[in-house]
Amino acid sequence: MIDVDKIRQTIVCGLKDTLGVPVIRSNTPRALPKLPFCSYTIQSLLKNSEGTWQRIGNGIDRIPARQVWSITVNTEKYITCAKLALLAHDFFSKSGVIWLKDNGIVIEKVGEVTPRDTLITVDYEHRQGFDVQLGIMNTQEYSEDDVIESAEIDGQYIKDGGNINDE
């Protein structure tokens, strides 16, 4: 299972340090902080990559996976919004890449920065944002008791990692 809280804490702390503004989850029931702030939505919590589970030992299996995050900067002034959105984009595309990798997150793709204003907010708030695709590892604990040592299929016995034997 992916550690959603660790990934969230890593990204939120990195963005907060980079931008110097509060970073919150979008669509929160809590009161919003004063402008400027950055918000995020996890658009895709888990998509296993094309591949198979790999047994890495110590009771752990893993498979490469992806998450997609939507990052939005909210400010009163357009120029502040543009600068903060570009800083956030740079965090995912360059300045934070090694730090994120050291915390188990690989950046696979950073989208273009686009306006995210709405008609309701256009007079008093500016929004710019982008999507970022994260490469992560989905892990699962296993027990040796869970291993199928052999199977019979159409009179053929499959065992020892896939060897077919007549018995």
Spans of features found by a protein language model:
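Small/polar-rich, solvent-exposed N-terminal microdomains that initiate assembly or binding
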Residues: M1-G59, E149-E167
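A broad, low-specificity signal marking well-ordered, structured residues that form hydrophobic/aromatic
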Residues: F37-S39, W69, I105, F130
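Oligomerization/assembly interface segments of phage tail-like spikes and tubes
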Residues: D61-I79, L86, E125-I136
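Short amphipathic alpha-helices in soluble, non-transmembrane regions
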Residues: L84-F92, V147-I148
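Acidic-leaning, charged glycine-interspersed low-complexity segments
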Residues: F91-E141
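Positively charged, small/polar-rich N-terminal and surface patches that mediate targeting and assembly
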Residues: T10, D17, Q128-T139, E144-V147, ...
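Residues in well-ordered beta-strands of folded domains
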Residues: I24, T41, T72, E108, ...
